[in-house]
């Protein structure tokens, strides 16, 4: 069997990726989230497939079909809530994964990092079109508001929006195409994940110390397969507590009301994992400016490899940048909270300050801290 897994064309790929992969011996539990994201993706594809068997992408029956899944299909309620809350777990793992990449300087593996940004954007697109499918009030109005932002693009904006809608408003054509997008995008994500892993295995994993670990590596199996299994069990435990005890805690009550184009909800807001970007969008009074800020809030991550001027890898031995990093995390939490609040004083002001802070920390304060730390190092050596 040993010879077969090392020589067989297909098994050799699996062997080099998950069994005999040389891995740094010092990587901590923060490195577990890559495998957890893989588990989340597989789970979302499987639960989504079973939901798609019973769902109808028609404005007249979409809401009823979701109700039918929950009431009449065997364990349909479980599949539906696993899928909905699985998306939340997916984003929690993804945000931690990106946060770990920033903290430990993993962005210096620039190809892997850039594919990761594409993955984040694709996942956000998938989650957005998926949220429209139950055809509740928040589904309909969320789709209307967010797609309408494209009309801010000069000259072609209005035409583009009508092209995406398939008409002059969000209607049957929109729902059908969003279902098609929601079905195909996870497979595109899977392809990008393979490219992400391909680039990662070209360079090897980073590690908490930020030093070269070529001299101290261990095989991935059994050491990290067991460690990842513990992470998977903890993830599933949290997910099952969420699904079985608090299935609607992360959802919006408005989505239990069928979509009605004549009645606007009091507060239109997306799912919690988009609230930070939504807060940045809302904090700019100009429509086009808001859209650009929304896109840049994710694309700004691509600047990390370019503006990094530190002599050290990661933030482990950089106390000034560490403080700035944790202010950045706190700022993100504030943005998420503000995104869910109504558009009125003081929330608008807090949102604007937090949005300025978000970009300033990445573009100004972190590079400045790196330069100060480099100077301190020069004084010592």
Curated annotation (Swiss-Prot):
Supply the alphabetized keyword list. Electron transport, Heme, Iron, Membrane, Metal-binding, Mitochondrion, Mitochondrion inner membrane, Respiratory chain, Transmembrane, Transmembrane helix, Transport, Ubiquinone
GO molecular function terms noted in the UniProt entry: metal ion binding; ubiquinol-cytochrome-c reductase activity
Bilayer-spanning residue ranges: 33-53, 77-98, 113-133, 178-198, 226-246, 288-308, 320-340, 347-367
The cellular location(s) given in this protein's UniProt record come to: Mitochondrion inner membrane
- Pfam families attached to this UniProt entry: Cytochrom_B_C, Cytochrome_B
How is the cofactor bound here?
Binds 2 heme b groups non-covalently.
Give GO cellular component annotations, separated by semicolons: mitochondrial inner membrane; respiratory chain complex III
Question: What topology does it adopt in the membrane?
Answer: Multi-pass membrane protein
Q: Where does heme b b562 bind?
A: 83, 182
Gene Ontology process terms (BP): mitochondrial electron transport, ubiquinol to cytochrome c
Entry superkingdom: Eukaryota
Cofactor annotation? heme b
Positions bound to heme b b566: 97, 196
Q: What does this protein do?
A: Component of the ubiquinol-cytochrome c reductase complex (complex III or cytochrome b-c1 complex) that is part of the mitochondrial respiratory chain. The b-c1 complex mediates electron transfer from ubiquinol to cytochrome c. Contributes to the generation of a proton gradient across the mitochondrial membrane that is then used for ATP synthesis.
> Which family is this sequence assigned to?
Belongs to the cytochrome b family.
Q: What else is known?
A: Heme 1 (or BL or b562) is low-potential and absorbs at about 562 nm, and heme 2 (or BH or b566) is high-potential and absorbs at about 566 nm.
Complexes and interactors:
The cytochrome bc1 complex contains 11 subunits: 3 respiratory subunits (MT-CYB, CYC1 and UQCRFS1), 2 core proteins (UQCRC1 and UQCRC2) and 6 low-molecular weight proteins (UQCRH/QCR6, UQCRB/QCR7, UQCRQ/QCR8, UQCR10/QCR9, UQCR11/QCR10 and a cleavage product of UQCRFS1). This cytochrome bc1 complex then forms a dimer.
**What is this protein's name?**
Cytochrome b
Q: Which organism is it from?
A: Phyllotis bonariensis
Q: What are the top taxonomic ranks of the organism?
A: Eukaryota, Metazoa, Chordata, Craniata, Vertebrata
Q: What is the gene called? A: MT-CYB
């Amino acid at each position: 069997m040993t010879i077969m897994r090392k020589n067989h064309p297909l098994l050799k790929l699996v062997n080099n990726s998950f069994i005999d992969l040389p891995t740094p011996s010092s990587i901590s539990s923060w490195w577990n989230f890559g495998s957890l994201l893989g588990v989340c993706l597989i789970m979302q594809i499987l639960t989504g497939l079973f939901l798609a068997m019973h769902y109808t992408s028609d404005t007249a029956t979409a809401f009823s079909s979701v109700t039918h899944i929950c009431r009449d299909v065997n364990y349909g309620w479980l599949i539906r809530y696993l899928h909905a809350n699985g998306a939340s777990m997916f984003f929690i793992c993804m945000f931690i994964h990106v946060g770990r990449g920033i903290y430990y300087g993993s962005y210096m593996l620039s190809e892997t990092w850039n594919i990761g940004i594409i993955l984040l954007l694709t996942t956000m697109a998938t989650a957005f079109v998926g949220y429209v499918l139950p055809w509740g009030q928040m589904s309909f109005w969320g789709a209307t508001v967010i797609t309408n932002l494209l009309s801010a693009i000069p000259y072609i904006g209005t035409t583009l929006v009508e092209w995406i809608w398939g008409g002059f408003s969000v209607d049957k054509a929109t729902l059908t195409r969003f279902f098609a997008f929601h079905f195909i995008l996870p497979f595109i994500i899977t392809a990008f994940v393979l490219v992400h892993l391909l680039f990662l295995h070209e360079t090897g994993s980073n590690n908490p110390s930020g030093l070269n670990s070529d001299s101290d590596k261990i095989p991935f199996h059994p050491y990290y397969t067991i460690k990842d299994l513990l992470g998977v069990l903890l993830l599933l435990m949290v997910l099952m507590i969420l699904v079985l005890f608090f299935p609607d805690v992360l959802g919006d009550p408005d989505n239990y009301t069928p979509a009605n184009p004549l009645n606007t909800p009091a507060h239109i807001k997306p799912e919690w994992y988009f609230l930070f970007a939504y807060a940045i969008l809302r904090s700019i009074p100009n429509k086009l400016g808001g859209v650009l800020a929304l896109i840049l809030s994710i694309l700004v991550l691509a600047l990390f490899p370019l503006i990094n001027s530190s002599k050290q890898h990661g933030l482990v031995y950089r106390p000034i940048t560490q403080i700035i990093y944790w202010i950045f995390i706190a700022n993100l939490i504030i943005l998420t909270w503000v995104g869910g609040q109504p558009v009125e004083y003081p929330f608008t002001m807090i949102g604007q300050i937090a949005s300025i802070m978000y970009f300033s920390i990445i573009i100004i304060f972190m590079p400045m801290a790196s330069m100060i730390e480099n100077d301190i190092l020069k004084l010592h050596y």
